Structures are given as C-alpha cells and as structure tokens.
C-alpha cells in the first residue's frame, strides 16, 4: 500500500492518517491530480471554472 501525505483542511497540519490527530477533522490528499495533455475533461473543468469565477468570454 502506498501512503500519501494528507492535509487537514481545518488546522492545516500534515499527516499520513485519515483523520487529523490534533482536531479530529477528516484529512484530504495533499497532492494535485496527475497531469495529462490528453485530458478528456479539461475543457469542461475550465468552462466551469470560468463560469464560477465570472471571467472569460463575453456573450454578444
């Protein structure tokens, strides 16, 4: 089994455990997703990000 370092979103501490040993919050994997030039969902993810942030092309 490969261990990945995890980070607590509440207190910001790093650990290898599923729950934070300090505050008890569920931890998240601290590594970003793997990059692929042939990303099949990249277009949709970028479109959603533009919509959520309110940036991008203006509709005429």
Swiss-Prot record:
Function summary: Involved in ribosome biogenesis; more specifically in 18S rRNA pseudouridylation and in cleavage of pre-rRNA.
Q: Which gene encodes it?
A: nop10
Give the protein's recorded name: Ribosome biogenesis protein Nop10
Q: Would the keyword Transferase turn up in this protein's UniProt record?
A: no
Recorded hits in Gene3D superfamilies, A to Z, give: H/ACA ribonucleoprotein complex, subunit Nop10
GO cellular component annotations, sorted alphabetically? ribonucleoprotein complex
Q: Which terms does the UniProt entry file under GO BP?
A: pseudouridine synthesis; rRNA processing
Its keywords, alphabetically, are: Ribonucleoprotein, Ribosome biogenesis, rRNA processing
Q: SUPFAM superfamilies from the entry? A: Nop10-like SnoRNP
């Amino acid at each position: 089994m490969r261990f990945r370092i995890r980070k607590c979103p509440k207190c910001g501490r790093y650990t290898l455990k599923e729950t934070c040993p300090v505050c008890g919050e569920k931890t998240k994997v601290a590594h970003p997703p793997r990059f692929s030039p042939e990303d099949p969902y990249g277009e949709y993810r970028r479109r959603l990000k533009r919509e959520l942030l309110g940036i991008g092309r203006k509709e005429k």
